[in-house]
């Protein structure tokens, strides 16, 4: 297993329910050990070793103090660790399975953060996988748990189930029809959070948004997932309506925009992250509307991931200035799109 190779994780490579709109679903469980201090102010490497011993050879342990900053950034871009772990968790580590759809962060904000990812809208599948791992760990290690408050976590907003359920969605139709603001306001009024592609603190890119639950106390894991699934079903329906409206009422203008973006990416020699993200979103929309039969969703996911800064530095084999990064990005994008 070489997680640093330029390949898609299984949750970005395989098909899933409603994957014309939904890229992926994720369940994350935050847990702390009963007899250890948290928040993790004094990050103890022995905590990592003790937890890692619980897992078998199906998982690979990667310690943050044994890899380079570039390798950490690659893990962030693949959504396998958080930006927090990359920047602040010197004695942190991550356990990964071969498919890269299970990532267990150790000594991040909490002792364990178990996250399971699935393609499309499959929150219940992700929940089942996460709870199975959680139960396995709890048989061998004692969690910090309170009968009244539930699982105790470093951040009070995670107390209770300790669960964050999130869905990554592509919403170009709602953005183009200028309905995205009202949709986000409606989502927030229902107690959910809308963030960028890399979660808290990140901005949307390629018209990709992340929707997650805010409440973790007072509801069961199943109830939270049911509520989020219902919200996502409404968002999916509204996005599809917006796409249909664009295709029916503004077909020529839409087709022109999509093919201009395709021409840009096929022929560019210098391109910024913002310009590439906008064009990739246009082409992904074109793929879903049937404009490009030769381009798969998998190829679109490759464009998003492999045009990120860390993957470009890996491709170049060195650090680059801003212009060099734009040149390498253009080259990588042309190669991906040209490989039919």
UniProtKB/Swiss-Prot annotation:
Functional summary from the UniProt entry: Catalyzes the specific phosphorylation of arginine residues in proteins.
Record gene name: mcsB
One GO-annotated biological process of the protein: phosphocreatine biosynthetic process
Catalytic EC class: transferase
PROSITE patterns membership: PHOSPHAGEN_KINASE_C (PS51510)
This protein's name: Protein-arginine kinase
TM stretches of this protein: none
Organism: Listeria monocytogenes serotype 4b (strain CLIP80459)
Gene Ontology cellular-component terms listed: extracellular space
Molecular function (Gene Ontology), one example: ATP binding
Catalyzed reactions per annotation: L-arginyl-[protein] + ATP = N(omega)-phospho-L-arginyl-[protein] + ADP + H(+)
